[in-house]
Amino acid sequence: MPHTAEQWNERYRGAPCDLPREPAEILAECLPLLPAGPALDLACGAGRNTLFLAGRPQSVTAADYSAAALEILESRARAAGHPVERSSVLAPPHGPRGAIRIAEVDLERARLPENSFELILCFQYLQRSLFRGMEKALRPGGFLLFETYTRAQVDPDRVGVTHRKDFPSGPHNPNYLLAAGELRTAFPTLETLFYRELRAGKGIATLLARRPDL
């Protein structure tokens, strides 16, 4: 899996036509529960989840380190008629619902604005230093939907899988993989609404959590 911005750029420039357009399955399933206020899509990639929310319509700030991925997102967003603005600030976009703010940022060093978003998405990305900031960036009553890979990806025997090929996606470095049960307790100030950890056939953990009202 790529690590540097240039490696990610090469990946996105190499196969833009093959990139998925459908949202993450869990996002589509949870949509009726999720607030429609300003959203933040961390490590958005080419923006399949950003565009899904913007079509709701919902204002979305889409953040990623790859300029190439964000170029694809901007092209798709403009083609769909969404207002687009570029910024290095991780704040809600200006403009009507359906507007998208595209932010090219290094998430390893990013600071999230407090009490700014009603919904935060984080898919297939793990940066533990962001966890406290993600909690604080939610407005009271705001939701976090988080899904990424676990260490079952590199320890398949523990879950009854005999070949690494059964886990074709995700990083190999354990530092970028969740330990068993880690995501369940990663956001102690939030109320867990749903948690799932798949170990047979997939090494993925999913969390839907909510910041309590004041």
Predicted segments with their positions:
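Conserved SAM-binding strand-loop segment of SAM-dependent methyltransferases
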Residues: 82-89, 95-107
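A short, conserved alpha-helix within the catalytic core of class I
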Residues: 126-135
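Conserved SAM-binding motif I beta-strand of class I
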Residues: 59-64
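A short acidic, Gly/Pro-enriched loop at the edge of an enzyme's catalytic core
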Residues: 110-119
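Conserved beta-strand signature within the Rossmann-like core of class I S-adenosyl-L-methionine
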Residues: 142-149
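Conserved SAM/SAH-binding beta-strand->alpha-helix loop
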Residues: 66-68
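Conserved class I S-adenosyl-L-methionine
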Residues: 1-34, 36-45
